[in-house]
């Protein structure tokens, strides 16, 4: 296996179970546990998280689960690797009743690594110091919430100059834009947060709302090149373009982009061209569009059968002309946009045993991406990893030999995974949301 220097190929599980049942007298040769591929766990067996496989690992819950979230870029600097970490998220809940939902700003801080500082000796003074250190290293969470009627399907954050905003798709069939500056301010100040929660949160309203879609939707993306330009797609197959206007408002083109025949599942603006975007749909297709053309004629390229079933998610690489897709068929596919007319992906990976729910390219490493699935797996991949046939290397475990060479890491331990994002300012840090809550982690592989 030829791998990049310093990169481990890991198939450890991150299942955070409490204990492992093991009979030393019957212990046989160790094997790597492969979810969905090997024999099921025996009665009394449990998976144990291998903390040595993680540089960072933290979990958080917010009450009602969140179907979607986005990372809010901050002013703490780029390429942050020094621990403890701080980060900001904007998320929306899926509560049991429509009136119980919230749009939330989360500040997670004091996030230490998994490797504790070594301590020697066991006298009382050192034990007291260890207890104090443990208390000081507890992760912290501040939460500012505003009421939102209706479950939130998707949240995407953008900066309009110095103003952070969130685009919010909800089950009530509206897309709203919320200003986030006040929420960001109060999660940094406990006293201001208390005043906000007591006196202000109920008064926070969207700065703009669009009810022109014919129903609810999930697809939403801010342009990375034109501040304020927005795309929204619904379950009725329509995509609308939002153009910012003076005074902090938007002009939404009532003419939808025509092409898909079923629900539009995801949208991605090109990172290099102002007017080009990609879409994927439950009609199994991926389409490339150019907004300079009339909406009825804007579809320039189509792969009609990109997956065997719904195409759920796409991610457009910021560094290479690649589009990544994940579908109900559990497949991950990499498309070279220079060869998109061929209708064939340049790579296909079938590790997930259930629909893929989220995909995203690493913001700094051009060949690395992550995916989550309804099989409760998060997988990390590197296109640059391949076996060197001249090296003579072979996998000692037959289960590992059957794995894709590019698979770096399999993380487990979540329930009903919905979305993941790499932190753009903290290399290698992944955040996911699931029914079981939020997880922030970094593996030894990326």
Swiss-Prot record:
The modification Phosphoserine is found at residues 119, 122, 344. InterPro entries: G-protein_beta_WD-40_rep, Glutamate-rich_WD_repeat, Histone-bd_RBBP4-like_N, WD40/YVTN_repeat-like_dom_sf, WD40_repeat_CS, WD40_repeat_dom_sf, WD40_rpt. GO terms for biological process: DNA replication; nucleosome assembly; nucleosome disassembly. Keywords: Chromosome, Nucleus, Phosphoprotein, Repeat, WD repeat. The lineage of its organism: Eukaryota, Metazoa, Chordata, Craniata, Vertebrata. It comes from the Eukaryota. It comes from Mus musculus. Histone binding-protein that regulates chromatin dynamics and minichromosome maintenance (MCM) loading at replication origins, possibly by promoting chromatin openness. It is found in: Nucleus, Nucleolus; Nucleus; Chromosome. Gene3D superfamilies: YVTN repeat-like/Quinoprotein amine dehydrogenase. Residues 1-29, 111-141 are annotated as: Disordered. One of its GO terms (cellular component) is nucleoplasm. Its main location: nucleus. This is Glutamate-rich WD repeat-containing protein 1.
């Amino acid at each position: 296996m030829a791998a990049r220097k310093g990169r481990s190929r890991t198939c450890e599980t991150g299942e955070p179970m409490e204990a492992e049942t093991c009979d030393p007298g019957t212990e046989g040769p160790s094997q790597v546990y492969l979810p969905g591929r090997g024999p099921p766990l025996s009665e009394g067996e449990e998976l144990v998280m291998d903390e040595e496989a993680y540089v960072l690992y933290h979990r958080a819950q917010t009450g009602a689960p969140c179907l979607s979230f986005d990372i809010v870029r901050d002013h703490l600097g780029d390429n942050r690797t020094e621990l403890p970490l701080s980060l900001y998220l904007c998320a929306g809940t899926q509560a049991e009743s429509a009136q119980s939902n919230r749009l939330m700003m989360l500040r997670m801080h004091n996030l230490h690594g998994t490797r504790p500082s070594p301590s020697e000796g066991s006298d009382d003074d050192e034990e007291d110091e260890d207890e104090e250190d443990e208390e000081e290293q507890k992760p912290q969470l501040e939460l500012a919430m505003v009421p939102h009627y209706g479950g939130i399907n998707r949240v995407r954050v953008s900066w309009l100059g110095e103003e952070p905003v969130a685009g919010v798709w909800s089950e009530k069939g509206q897309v709203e834009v919320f200003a986030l500056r006040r929420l960001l301010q109060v999660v940094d100040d406990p006293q201001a947060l208390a005043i906000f929660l007591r006196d202000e949160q109920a008064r926070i309203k969207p700065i703009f709302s669009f009810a022109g879609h014919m129903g609810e939707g999930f697809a939403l993306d801010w342009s990375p090149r034109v501040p304020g330009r927005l795309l929204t797609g619904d379950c009725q197959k329509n995509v609308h373009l939002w153009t910012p206007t003076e005074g902090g408002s938007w002009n939404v083109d009532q003419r939808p982009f025509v092409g898909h025949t079923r629900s539009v599942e995801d949208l991605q603006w090109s990172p290099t061209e102002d007017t080009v975007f990609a879409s994927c749909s439950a009609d199994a297709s991926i389409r490339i569009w150019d907004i300079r053309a009339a909406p009825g004629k804007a579809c320039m390229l189509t792969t009609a059968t990109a997956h065997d079933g719904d195409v759920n998610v796409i991610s457009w690489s910021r560094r290479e002309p690649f589009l990544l897709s994940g579908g109900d068929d559990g497949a991950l596919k990499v498309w070279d946009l220079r060869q998109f007319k061929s209708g064939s992906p340049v790579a296909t990976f079938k590790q997930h045993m259930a629909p893929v729910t989220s995909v995203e390219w690493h913001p700094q490493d051009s060949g690395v991406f992550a995916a989550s699935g309804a099989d409760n797996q998060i997988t990390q991949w590197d296109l640059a990893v391949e076996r060197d046939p001249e090296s003579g290397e072979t996998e000692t475990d037959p289960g590992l030999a059957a794995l894709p060479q590019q698979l770096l890491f399999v993380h487990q331990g979540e329930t009903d995974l919905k979305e993941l994002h790499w932190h753009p300012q903290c290399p290698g840090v992944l955040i996911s949301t699931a029914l079981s809550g939020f997880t922030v982690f970094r593996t030894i592989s990326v």
